[in-house]
Curated annotation (Swiss-Prot):
<dbReference type="Pfam" id="PF00006">
    <property type="entry name" value="ATP-synt_ab"/>
</dbReference>
<dbReference type="InterPro" id="IPR003593">
    <property type="entry name" value="AAA+_ATPase"/>
</dbReference>
<comment type="similarity">
    <text>Belongs to the ATPase alpha/beta chains family.</text>
</comment>
<keyword id="KW-0472">Membrane</keyword>
<dbReference type="GO" id="GO:0045259">
    <property type="term" value="C:proton-transporting ATP synthase complex"/>
</dbReference>
<keyword id="KW-0066">ATP synthesis</keyword>
<keyword id="KW-0547">Nucleotide-binding</keyword>
<dbReference type="InterPro" id="IPR027417">
    <property type="entry name" value="P-loop_NTPase"/>
</dbReference>
<dbReference type="GO" id="GO:0046933">
    <property type="term" value="F:proton-transporting ATP synthase activity, rotational mechanism"/>
</dbReference>
<feature type="binding site">
    <location>
        <begin position="160"/>
        <end position="167"/>
    </location>
    <ligand>
        <name>ATP</name>
    </ligand>
</feature>
<dbReference type="InterPro" id="IPR005722">
    <property type="entry name" value="ATP_synth_F1_bsu"/>
</dbReference>
<comment type="subunit">
    <text>F-type ATPases have 2 components, CF(1) - the catalytic core - and CF(0) - the membrane proton channel. CF(1) has five subunits: alpha(3), beta(3), gamma(1), delta(1), epsilon(1). CF(0) has three main subunits: a(1), b(2) and c(9-12). The alpha and beta chains form an alternating ring which encloses part of the gamma chain. CF(1) is attached to CF(0) by a central stalk formed by the gamma and epsilon chains, while a peripheral stalk is formed by the delta and b chains.</text>
</comment>
<keyword id="KW-0997">Cell inner membrane</keyword>
<dbReference type="InterPro" id="IPR036121">
    <property type="entry name" value="ATPase_F1/V1/A1_a/bsu_N_sf"/>
</dbReference>
<keyword id="KW-1003">Cell membrane</keyword>
<dbReference type="InterPro" id="IPR020003">
    <property type="entry name" value="ATPase_a/bsu_AS"/>
</dbReference>
<dbReference type="GO" id="GO:0005524">
    <property type="term" value="F:ATP binding"/>
</dbReference>
Amino acid sequence: MNQDSGCEGVGEVVRVMPAVVDVEFAHGGLPDILHALKSEKDYQGKQLVLEVAQHLGDGVVRCVAMGSTDGLSRGDKFINTGSPISVPVGRKTLGRVFDVLGEPIDGVGDVGADVEYHSIHAHAPKLSEQKVATEVLVTGIKVIDLLAPYLKGGKVGLFGGAGVGKTVLIMELISNIARAHKGFSVFAGVGERTREGNDLYREMVESGVINEDEREKSQAVLVYGQMNEPPGARMRVALSALTMAEYFRDAEGQDVLFFVDNVFRFTQSGSEVSALLGRVPSAVGYQPTLASEMGAMQERITSTHKGSITSVQAIYVPADDLTDPAPSTSFLHLDSTTVLSRQISELGIYPAVDPLDSTSQALSVDVVGAEHYEVAREVQRILQTYKSLQDIIAILGMDELSQEDKILVARARKIQRFLSQPFHVAEVFTGNPGVFVSLEDTVRSFKGLVEGQYDDLPEAAFYMVGGIDAAVEKAKALK
């Protein structure tokens, strides 16, 4: 956080609750809402920063703590910085790992004195400055590129319950896209496991996205507020990362990739803070300001005439319920939704993307072309028909189906297995080398499948392969 802000007053702590602190400014200098306060002394070896959330009257402000309040007591002094929390931006941040306050946590040292700092609270670009995305972003993952393609400069949500593969999928997307991407990537770790943050950093170093010898030649910035941190830090870390991404978009005209894992934790931390601030909860116990908080963040993630931000957001779905207010509020802001299904993961098909639930605004003739659109819709039609026949198959068996339906079911099962794919990031666990499948190969492969060109191949040949040529080779090996 910027240390050069001018002081406007000193306050005294009058009440301490977990993650929320009341500070009294008896002699004037009352801070504005969203302004930062810094402690005069250190706690656990570092200054504690508070963000003003409410004015309670009589010179008392209620603040959200950005760090642990252990050791804090009544009477402790806090200085009004006169400005919101600010984080470093620009090329000096590349290859580094930061916390919510923009402090480096990678043990490499400070970012330097000649670094620009920007407030984490900013307005979304005006409508006249925004640009509509129409170019498809190829991910190399068959099920996504075919059925729910991503737009360059668009917003993507990866929805899924616990343990269905959201983080693995987002790491594979980083591996596939960030390597080939010429611009910069910013990753926001919001309330997820510290181990996963460490794994991602190591993965980026190995793939060359982060250069440990010459940091400024790196292509990525990591900002972490993990699940062991107070709710204030988890609530603001996405904004800290977004501020860094906005700088690359606006000041440098870059096409930026912005990854968030996990947006649900952003909502969850807001709910914790809202309860501590004494607000009346709304549906399912969430904060009454859920829609406006989500909107304030999501509206900043957009593409302008200067540059673009393509965002991929992992969104945890509590109890696999997509109607829960947290995931359903996110749906409104997204161009593409990739829904991960527990039923598909139980079949051992990974990535466990639901081909019928996942949607994309890009899946139109105008964007992807007639051939791609027709193949995708035919794949969905076959899978939907198979789904509707499953009850009949379970009760009466395959023999009761017409010959036409039997062929369609066999084709659907092959398509279902062909939607699986070995990942680069999972290679160490599965032993299968990861595969990047081009869009042309994906469309060609599925076109052949829906036309019945590969009806003679066994189902097993289509499981965990890349393109159709690999499936044909596997079928020969199985004979």
